[in-house]
Swiss-Prot record:
Protein name: Probable ubiquitin carboxyl-terminal hydrolase MINDY-4
Organism: Bos taurus
Keywords: Hydrolase, Phosphoprotein, Protease, Thiol protease, Ubl conjugation pathway
Catalytic activity: Thiol-dependent hydrolysis of ester, thioester, amide, peptide and isopeptide bonds formed by the C-terminal Gly of ubiquitin (a 76-residue protein attached to proteins as an intracellular targeting signal)
Function, in words: Probable hydrolase that can remove 'Lys-48'-linked conjugated ubiquitin from proteins.
Bias-annotated ranges (Basic and acidic residues): 180-202, 346-355
Length: 763
């Protein structure tokens, strides 16, 4: 994650605290000593979304004395959940890091060589963690206390609440002596990767006895390609076995160790080569490529499935890359050992992708074997892993099978010539810059319960881009996916609408690239060239990285990892516009224009028809009629006016057609989905229906409902219009008092009456 971005988010947290507490002088002083940048967040809602504090915010609002600032919410969260851990665990307990919602809450324990057995009961997240004395005495002679990571036992829960582990009071002298012996081990500080991999382990729901194995399970070759749950950690060994009083033993050295597989070319390439691709985080995104549904079997690498009672991987979720043990691990028979030990992960484990930010600093790649290097030569330990079968859908993401290659993404920083060309296409001159309305506009959603599907517009200007994206998001919400009820489609969860936003952006840029390629522009926070000559810097274009993809599925995967930049911003609207232009290419965009000197952003930062057409149809043509119109000037010169060449997914209606200024063709007026971008009074908004039959069955057009959404109108409630085509309205009626939206509506349904159903008509 970019350090500069982290600093700006932290500074925004402090500014919000000072503002809400009325510390005006301190607030002004901070602005003077640390001025804001383009990455600063000025909206409390945006700040909550960036830090994923929506759950804590809603929980706080329900309290009698709610806290006023996000900083206090975070502070109370830490105090409530981690303030008393020190009373229940040993002195080496580490303070957990702040976790993102739906990600692992680390609850570290010191590694031990005792035979203490922890039993976790997670059937109900509101029950506390319990330890059974009877199970301890039963399993002391043959169980392991060291976890697979050597230092940490983590559990992931969908709730934001964590409970401390209750340890057994009055440990025996044997247990105490084992603690002392563990302290004497030359253990190095766990690496960052080891800490992260601690998030991946979660006990099974129900009663799990750690360290007790159910035995090996025979599996078919097909299973071995799907799940390598039973495998030994290559080149790693466990710590020494626990010493019994009066009979000290020297640990035996393992005589058989497996080696790390050599990275292979093609589909069988190992994760080591993938995680160390020069493209950094881009290549790692393949681990997040496949999502699963509750009914689909998880395709995990492993030797077979373990019984339900064995230890299991909990976190096959948004931050869990696959672990491919390689062909060597398949050929090596498992060696069973009950020696206690700390078995860190192998070097094959890729660095976890920063999916919400879409980037990963190279500095985070550290040696993943810093712990294991101190322990070589000890006994090998069979690593028990299993698959969680009771996960919530939003937390599930399938690890890819071995046939899935890494993302084929070509990335390069923008250069001066490309930036000049883009500005000329956008503004007509390379001296123009994006206005603040454009820079601060992203695709953040409405917080109102009845308008959760809606994208909020801060100020005028980029309304054409927002309306086009809104239409594509509605297409995904209403007519794709498995939402069974209309109300569920229009009241999506945060994860669902974010997913639909990523799909909508993917459709827009893929369509602009002729369904053959796409270019996604992302801000890096670092200036890549020095502006010289006839070019004026705006702080946005100079920081872009251009990511080119030629596969739609990989494009969707890539956007799901980087959707944070589009949704939370601050340049989401700019990034999408530039992505569409570069996907189409500046040369083809210029060829789409009727006049080569046209541009996509007009006066006062308004969107032109060319820009809206580019987002809706993939071509930046200047007109809305069908096909091409030839104009003969009379002297033999023929001027070609380019229109819409094919039927569009999202439609378009214009008030200009009511005034006979233009004519909207049937390719836009009758789209594939009943969603229309409406141009009225130099502003773009959206009109849509939930009935797909409206465009397929003429009988559905007799009486139907349309929903209207305007992201700029500070709309608080859903506006539903009932259109009746059986009751016609005279066209000679005084148009001065007729809402423009009704006039736009009648360009599609001639003379139809419109009932606003109690909503105030928008004039």
């Amino acid at each position: 994650m970019d350090t500069l971005f982290v600093e700006e988010v932290a500074a925004s947290l402090i500014r919000e605290f000072l503002s809400r507490k009325g510390l005006k002088k301190t607030y002004v002083t901070m602005d003077q000593e640390r001025p804001r940048s383009d990455l600063s967040i000025n909206s409390r809602n945006d700040l909550r979304k960036v830090l994923h504090l929506e759950f804590l915010y809603k929980e706080n609002k329900a309290k009698e004395n709610p806290l006023k600032t996000n900083l206090e919410l975070i502070t109370r969260y830490f105090l409530d959940h981690f303030g008393n851990i020190g009373n229940n665990v040993t002195q080496e307990t580490r303070i957990p890091e702040l976790s993102v919602p739906k990600k692992s809450n680390k609850l570290p324990l010191r590694s031990s060589e005792t035979t203490l057995v922890n039993i976790y009961h997670l059937a109900d997240e509101d029950e506390t963690w319990r330890t059974s004395l009877s199970e301890i005495s039963k399993a002391r002679h043959d169980s392991l206390d060291g976890d697979v990571l050597g230092h940490f036992v983590s559990s992931k829960r969908s709730s934001h609440k964590s409970r401390p582990i209750k340890t057994v009071a009055g440990e025996s002298p044997t247990v105490a002596s084992a603690w002392e012996k563990t302290d004497k081990l030359p253990m190095s500080e766990p690496s960052l990767d080891t800490k992260r991999m601690g998030e991946k382990v979660r006990p099974k729901s129900g009663l799990i006895v750690r360290g007790m194995m159910a035995g090996p399970i025979a599996s078919s070759p097909q299973d071995s390609l799907r799940k390598r749950s039973l495998r030994r950690s290559p080149a790693l060994s466990s710590a020494t076995q626990p010493h019994k009083e009066g009979s000290p033993q020297e640990p035996e050295l393992s005589t058989h160790t497996s080696t790390c597989p050599t990275p292979l070319e093609g589909p069988a390439s190992s994760t080591a080569s993938t995680s160390r691709s020069p493209q950094g985080p881009l290549s790692e995104l393949t681990w997040e490529k496949q999502r699963t549904s509750p009914g689909s079997p998880p395709h995990l690498p492993g030797k077979g499935l373990l019984p339900r009672g064995s230890g299991r991987w909990r976190d096959l979720s948004e931050d869990s890359p696959a672990v491919d043990s390689g062909s060597e691990a398949i050929r090596t028979p498992p060696k069973f050992s009950l020696s206690s030990g700390n078995v860190p992960k192998t070097q094959e484990r890729p660095e976890r992708a920063f999916e919400r930010q879409g980037s990963q600093p190279a500095s985070l790649r550290k040696n993943q074997l810093s712990v294991s290097n101190k322990l070589e030569g000890d006994l090998d330990v069979l690593q028990l892993e299993d698959v969680e079968d009771e996960l919530v859908r939003e937390e599930i993401i399938l690890s890819p099978v071995s046939s899935v290659l890494k993302l084929q993404v070509v990335s390069k920083p923008i250069d001066l010539s490309v930036a000049k060309d883009i500005k000329t296409i956008l503004f007509g001159s390379s001296f123009c810059c994006f206005s603040d309305e454009w820079k601060l506009q992203s695709f953040s959603f409405n917080d109102s319960v009845s308008l959760k599907y809606g994208i909020v517009q801060n100020k005028g200007g980029p309304c054409g881009v927002l309306a086009a994206v809104q239409g594509c998001v509605l297409q995904k919400l209403l007519f794709e996916g498995d939402s069974s009820a209309d109300c569920a489609r229009l009241q999506p969860s945060n994860a669902r609408r974010t997913h639909c936003l990523a799909l909508a952006i993917a459709d827009i840029v893929w369509r602009a690239g002729g369904c053959e390629r796409a270019v996604v522009t992302l801000a890096s926070g670092t200036q890549h060239f020095s502006p010289t000559g006839k070019y004026k810097a705006d702080g946005v274009l100079e920081t872009l990285i251009l990511h080119s993809l030629t596969c739609y599925e990989e494009l969707v995967t890539f956007l799901q990892q980087s959707i944070h930049q589009f949704e939370a911003g601050p340049y989401g609207c700019v990034l999408l516009t530039l992505s569409a232009i570069l996907s189409r290419s500046t040369e083809l965009v210029r060829q789409d224009f009727d006049v080569p000197t046209s541009h996509l952003i007009g006066a006062h930062g308004y969107c032109t028809q060319e820009l809206v057409n580019l987002l809706l149809t993939g071509k930046a043509v200047s007109n809305v009629f069908n096909d091409v119109v030839e104009l003969d000037s009379g002297n033999g010169d023929v001027t070609l006016l380019k229109g819409i060449s094919t039927r569009s997914d999202i439609g378009f209606l214009s008030l200009f057609e009511h005034y006979n200024v233009c004519q909207v063709g049937c390719f836009l007026k009758t789209p594939r989905f009943p969603i229309w971008v409406v141009c009225s009074e130099s502003h773009f908004s959206v009109l849509f229906s939930q009935q797909l039959e409206l465009l397929r069955d003429w009988r559905a057009e007799r009486l139907f409902d349309l929903y209207y959404y305007d992201g700029l109108a500070n709309q608080q409630e859903q506006i539903r219009l009932t259109v009746d085509t059986t009751q016609t309205v005279p066209e000679d009626r005084d148009n001065g008092l007729v809402p423009p939206l009704e006039l736009c509506n009648r360009t599609k349904w001639k003379g139809a009456s419109v009932n606003w159903n109690g909503s105030e008509p928008i004039l």
